[in-house]
Amino acid sequence: MKVLVPATTTNLGAGFDVFGLALDLFNEVEFSFDTKETTIESTGKYASDLKDHNLFFEVLRFFERKTGYRVPPVRIKQTCNIPVSSGLGSSAAVIVAALHIANEGTGRNLSREDLMKLAVELEGHPDNVVPAFTGGLVVCYQNGSHLDFEKFEIDLSLTFLVPNFPVCTNEMRKILPEKVPFEDAVFNIKNSCQFLAKIAAGKIKEALKYVGDRLHQNYRINGNKKMKEFVEAILSKNPEYWFVSGSGPSVCSNINDFEGIPYLKDVLKLRVNNRGMIVSE
């Protein structure tokens, strides 16, 4: 059996912890239960960037604790096509894949919504894992254990600049302030509302004019020397729009001139994936 889990980008600038978008780049995970021991093998372009497979094992054990079901031994082989620790949902892809595998191995007792809630509990916020399940542009709401979302199917291509250094999401969250100026909060509300209004009106490309942010990006950029140099070089190209993908360090921008950008490793031109996770026998 095989499951393909898409890369995701979140926040989209103004929609901090709310907006998530699935992309047409997938980690491919093949699995089989005809084994006596759980093993995980990784191949693919970004496999060498993985430090270990602890997250896979952690998710399988988490599933057992939360559901009471025992996951049988499973042989897992993943092809890593999503950059690791780069703000494109590599951890979310592992979480979603591992939960799907655990559910398959225990009789498919949980619905997609049940798995989604477990994924959000593991990840800590919904904007990566929900679009990985559903595809499309997702607007998420979480209040305690209550999760709600709306999905928009959109036709859009985006360019992501991926640097050659990783960042830790948890560390980048610690950089964020406990309080922000009132006018900064209003700025983000205006942009996020106008972004969604353009999406709802079918004016997809116009929506990208409203990704400006004052709540999280500058704090993260200024808190990491390499990331600051990377973003400043991108901004020197005078892009029409840009935003940090997730907590970084990757950046989405419409520039076409990549000369002189330090640390640049990959340029990924990706379309929105409106289907989400793909399962095949």
Curated annotation (Swiss-Prot):
Task: Name the enzyme group at the top EC level.
Answer: transferase
**One Pfam short name:** GHMP_kinases_N
Might you give the EC number(s) for this enzyme? Answer: 2.7.1.39
Q: Where does ATP bind?
A: 83-93
Q: Which PROSITE patterns match?
A: GHMP_KINASES_ATP
Pathway listed: Amino-acid biosynthesis; L-threonine biosynthesis; L-threonine from L-aspartate: step 4/5
| Compartments, record wording | Cytoplasm
Q: What does this protein do?
A: Catalyzes the ATP-dependent phosphorylation of L-homoserine to L-homoserine phosphate.
The protein depicted here goes by the name Homoserine kinase
